[in-house]
């Protein structure tokens, strides 16, 4: 299997290298691609050093079987035809193609089969907050159809990339040394000791693009008419996102039956003993593969409502891991060139 990583120097690109090694992904040859800024950098994979090649419009992808692409929407749009020209499967981490009808949007625990129909050779990886939420919603949907979901997300700095993590750390350092944060470029405001109730650009409805992604992507992945309403907030933690989720189902569900299906669900770890201070926290889910869920309880305002809390590493399951799992599924069913 010949594999490429486009955007190898970024936070998700680096996570691809770790996950592919950890899972012993079947790679005979690995090629790393990047922009002019990262071309020439060297990274080690399974004891061997690889140099990042400049991404160009040429025949570099002619013999590539799978390309993991995490270099931003504009790069995905510009190079999609170049990458897929000779039959390479492009698994794209950007938002560029997610809502296009001829591009499947896939979370393997839910709709892996959708990846088999890809007329453009592209499979889209969903938004990180969407992935973590639907992995938890799907087992509940099997108990009773979910009508509405309301979410407040608490998203760490790493969701904005490696440079954003560095900026947050730099802000804390500056505050300790001088009393104020001087480095503010990756976020619209100081993030250290703060929360920012905006992720991505505002739309004309005053919902952000991040919040609208959750609305549309959830419906597409789950093949459902479920309606979601989200408030996405950037918080001053480094890694791992959290979400407070309110779920309205067609019929009332007992907490015990929800716990039971979540405990058995693939990709989910139940952490739910709040009387003993046991519940999911981003500090503990960082670096882990599963989505952690707890604080499961009946909603006090709606007899058909359930509320819960989840956390997950958005660079792993929210990005690189989900893409690798898609590729593993394609290999398992023999659906790669």
Description of each model-found segment:
Residues 67, 157-337:
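Charged docking surfaces used in two-component/phosphorelay signaling
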């Amino acid at each position: 299997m010949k594999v490429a990583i486009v955007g190898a120097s970024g936070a998700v690109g680096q996570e691809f290298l770790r996950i592919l090694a950890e899972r012993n992904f079947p790679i005979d040859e690995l090629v790393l691609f990047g922009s002019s800024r990262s071309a020439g950098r060297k990274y080690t994979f399974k004891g061997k050093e690889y140099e990042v090649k400049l991404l160009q419009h040429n025949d570099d992808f002619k013999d590539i079987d799978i390309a993991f692409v995490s270099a931003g929407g504009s790069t995905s749009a510009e190079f999609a035809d170049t990458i897929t020209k000779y039959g390479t499967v492009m698994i794209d981490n950007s938002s560029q193609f997610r809502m296009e009808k001829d591009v499947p949007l896939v979370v393997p625990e839910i709709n892996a089969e959708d990846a088999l129909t890809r007329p453009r050779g592209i499979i889209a990886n969903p938004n990180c907050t969407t992935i973590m939420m639907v992995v938890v919603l799907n087992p509940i949907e099997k108990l009773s159809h979910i009508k509405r979901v309301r979410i407040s997300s608490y998203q760490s700095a790493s969701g904005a990339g490696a440079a954003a993590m560095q900026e947050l750390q730099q802000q804390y350092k500056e505050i300790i040394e001088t009393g104020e944060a001087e480095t503010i470029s990756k976020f619209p405001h100081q993030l250290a000791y703060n929360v920012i109730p905006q992720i991505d650009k505002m739309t004309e409805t005053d919902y952000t693009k991040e919040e609208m992604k959750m609305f549309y992507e959830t419906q597409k992945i789950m093949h459902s008419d479920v309606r979601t309403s989200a408030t996405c907030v950037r918080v001053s933690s480094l890694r791992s996102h959290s979400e407070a989720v309110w779920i309205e189902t067609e019929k009332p569900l007992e907490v015990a039956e929800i716990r039971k299906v979540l405990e058995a669900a693939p990709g989910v770890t139940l952490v739910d003993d709040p009387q003993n201070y046991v519940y999911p926290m981003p500090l503990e889910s960082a670096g882990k593969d599963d989505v952690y869920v707890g604080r499961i309880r009946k909603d006090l305002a709606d007899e058909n409502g359930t509320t819960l809390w989840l956390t997950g590493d958005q660079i792993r399951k929210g990005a690189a891991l989900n893409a690798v799992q898609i590729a593993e599924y394609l290999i398992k069913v023999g659906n790669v060139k």
